[in-house]
């Protein structure tokens, strides 16, 4: 997403989050679907600028305000640089992700929809080559007016029509006789390549600039499009030359600035926020009716549900303003970041505490469980903060893809590590069921822990793995099903967890150990932690249970 300045956000942010969180929030903000990318000393051969799903009458505007190449203009051969616009089956699949690193996308032909913008620094022109069947994909120089009479459709398409000799071959374009051709589609040659268009290239102070816009004219051209920049001279190892680039990208659909897959997200997040709010209110009503069996962990579960609801509410509002204005409200965006961070921390803390049996079965965590909390929770908080920072940066940044993959791996590691307290509790109950006289109670608790273990496993698979596979295979306009699956799985996990561990007298998980059993657990915990000296055992009766 785009980078924009945030003015005055530091004063309005809560002080308890500390300077590091403020720094991460201030590193970059989202300005919606109006992207501005500035790279200095860049050496990559391929830069993935953006991916967007277009409907009919959707428009893409690109303004290359600065391109300064490392090669000197005195060289005989002009550098091979330019843009490529490719339609792909899924937004998560890049057009050149599996290609040879030494192959230049600007030199290849394609039977699928592909548009190349070849920058010729010698002749100061940009050659536009179109491949595939493109009946109504309109390309014109310049940017669209701010308030067109018809959204997405330009009044005319200024292009240069090449000469065609009697043999049927295409000759060089004649700039002197070029004229607008209106909104008529281009004629396709015998070779399958459309006739070339030529755009002007500006040259000022050893830098180049030009702008163009693309309009999706029919349903046949709808789809997910990837816009990339290529510097083919840097594809050869050891011959990289640094270059500077500043580009502005503005994408729009007839209904707003959101991509095709993001248009339903405003309503989706609003509905899911209401569902989590209703679940939280229902959970609090259960806690108020069963005060005798309520523990602190129950109120922590309620706080998690309400925080999730507020986070989705702010997320929904952000998408609404992005769709209508092209950028979110800065204050609401920061509130979404804060609630998103709180939600991620509370989620893993709650899962780990329930799995370890804290407050339900025991009141002291062992050294192993403390290490899990000391490692997993800070990593998960860091991963959530890092995801927020990545969302506020441009996709074309040099470290964007690498950090996104690393952070996804860290999140999976955290999800796997958080299962250890549940496994340890299951093993403890298995050992206890054969050593003490409370076999029935321990077996009931063991069955409940096994169910919870399966629930956590399913939650991780549905929200981390299956959801990503779904996004990779569904059509571009249905990719919002990824968010639906994630939020639906989260809601189902919350409801099942509340049902399994609700405050009820007949819940085996809430049957605190009495005398002998509790003494054995406290003795084991104190032995593992090394704080046994100076402690005396106190008997607990049913009347001594914690009341909230």
From Swiss-Prot:
Its main location: Golgi. Keywords: Glycoprotein, Golgi apparatus, Membrane, Signal, Transmembrane, Transmembrane helix. The chain crosses the membrane at residues 268-288, 297-317, 341-361, 372-392, 406-426, 454-474, 478-498. Pfam families: GOST_TM. Glycans are attached at residues 57, 63, 109, 205, 209, 539. It is a multi-pass membrane protein. One of its GO terms (biological process) is negative regulation of toll-like receptor signaling pathway. It is found in: Golgi apparatus, cis-Golgi network membrane; Golgi apparatus, trans-Golgi network membrane; Golgi apparatus membrane. GO terms for cellular component: cis-Golgi network membrane; Golgi apparatus; Golgi membrane; membrane. InterPro entries: GOST_TM, GPR107/GPR108-like. Residues 1-32 form the signal peptide. Residues 165-190 are annotated as: Disordered. May play a role in intracellular immune modulation by activating NF-kappaB response and attenuating Toll-like-receptor response. Belongs to the LU7TM family. This is Protein GPR108. It comes from Bos taurus (Bovine). The gene is GPR108.
């Amino acid at each position: 997403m785009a980078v924009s300045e945030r003015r005055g956000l530091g004063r309005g942010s809560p002080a308890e989050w500390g300077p590091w969180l403020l720094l991460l929030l201030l590193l970059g903000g989202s300005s919606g679907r109006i992207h501005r990318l500035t790279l200095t000393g860049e050496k990559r051969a391929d830069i993935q600028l953006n991916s967007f799903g277009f409907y009919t009458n959707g428009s893409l505007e690109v303004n290359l305000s600065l391109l300064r190449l490392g090669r000197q203009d005195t060289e005989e051969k002009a550098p091979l640089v330019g843009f490529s616009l490719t339609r792909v089956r899924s937004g998560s699949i890049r057009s050149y992700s599996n290609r040879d690193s030494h192959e230049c996308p600007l030199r290849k032909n394609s039977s699928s929809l592909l548009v190349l913008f070849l920058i010729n620094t010698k002749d100061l022109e940009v050659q536009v080559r179109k491949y595939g069947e493109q009946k109504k994909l309109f390309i014109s120089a310049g940017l669209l007016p701010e308030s067109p009479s018809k959204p997405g459709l330009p009044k005319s398409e200024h292009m240069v029509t090449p000469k065609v000799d009697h043999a049927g071959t295409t000759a060089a374009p004649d700039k002197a006789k070029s004229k607008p051709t209106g909104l008529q589609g281009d004629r396709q040659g015998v070779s399958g390549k459309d006739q070339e268009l030529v755009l002007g290239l500006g040259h000022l102070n050893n830098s180049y600039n030009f702008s163009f816009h693309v309009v999706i004219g029919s349903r046949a051209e709808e789809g997910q499009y990837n816009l990339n920049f290529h510097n083919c001279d840097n594809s050869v190892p050891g011959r990289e030359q640094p270059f500077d680039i500043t580009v502005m990208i503005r994408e729009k659909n007839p209904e707003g600035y959101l991509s095709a897959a993001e248009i339903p997200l405003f309503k989706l997040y609003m509905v899911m926020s209401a569902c989590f709010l209703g679940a939280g209110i229902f959970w609090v009503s259960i806690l108020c009716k069963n005060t005798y069996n309520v523990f602190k962990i129950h109120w922590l579960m309620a706080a998690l549900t309400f925080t999730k609801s507020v986070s989705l509410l702010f997320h929904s509002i952000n998408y609404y303003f992005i769709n209508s204005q092209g950028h979110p409200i800065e204050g609401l965006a920061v509130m979404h970041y804060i609630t998103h961070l709180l939600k991620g921390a509370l989620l893993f803390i709650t899962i780990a505490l329930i799995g370890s049996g804290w407050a339900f079965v025991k009141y002291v965590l062992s050294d192993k469980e403390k290490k899990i909390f000391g490692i997993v929770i800070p990593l998960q908080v860091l991963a959530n903060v890092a995801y927020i920072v990545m969302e506020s940066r441009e996709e074309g940044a040099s470290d964007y893809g690498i950090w996104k993959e690393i952070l996804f791996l860290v999140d999976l590691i955290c999800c796997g590590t958080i299962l250890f307290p549940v496994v340890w509790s299951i093993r403890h109950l298995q050992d206890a069921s054969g050593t003490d006289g409370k076999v029935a109670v321990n077996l009931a608790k063991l069955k409940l822990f096994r169910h919870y273990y399966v629930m956590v496993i399913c939650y991780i698979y549905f929200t981390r793995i299956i959801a990503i596979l779904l996004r990779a295979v569904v059509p571009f306009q249905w990719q919002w099903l990824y968010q639906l699956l994630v939020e639906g799985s989260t809601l189902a996990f919350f409801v099942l967890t509340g049902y399994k561990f609700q405050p009820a007298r007949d819940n085996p998980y809430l049957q605190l150990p009495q005398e002998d059993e509790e003494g054995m657990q406290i003795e084991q915990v104190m032995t593992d932690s090394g704080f046994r000296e100076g402690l005396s055992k106190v008997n607990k009766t049913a009347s001594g249970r914690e009341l909230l």
